[in-house]
Amino acid sequence: MPYVLQQKETEQIYTTTLVNHYGLAYYGVKFWIEQEEANEQAYAYLESQAVQDPDSWQVIEWEESEMKISNVKLKNSSVWQLFWSGITRKPEVRKLEI
């Protein structure tokens, strides 16, 4: 199961540029495979990315299919922000306001 970062108040999911197993860069959901690893590394990762208030983020568990559909909705573009409702268990994307 993938474990992802969610902002507690806004329900935003942490997205960034990643590299797939083919060595290709893509824009998607930052994830860990193991819960223990996610819990241990999340805070330091957020700090390394200069995220303000890393304490406002939590690790949540997703189904693999939920992560896949969320990455598709991001359209490999950083102009989209991803939000996740634990009630509906569906992703919502919003265009980044500049």
Regions found by a protein language model. Give the residues of each.
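A short beta-strand micro-motif
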Residues: Y3-K8
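Short, flexible N-terminal segments of the mature chain
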Residues: I13-Q41
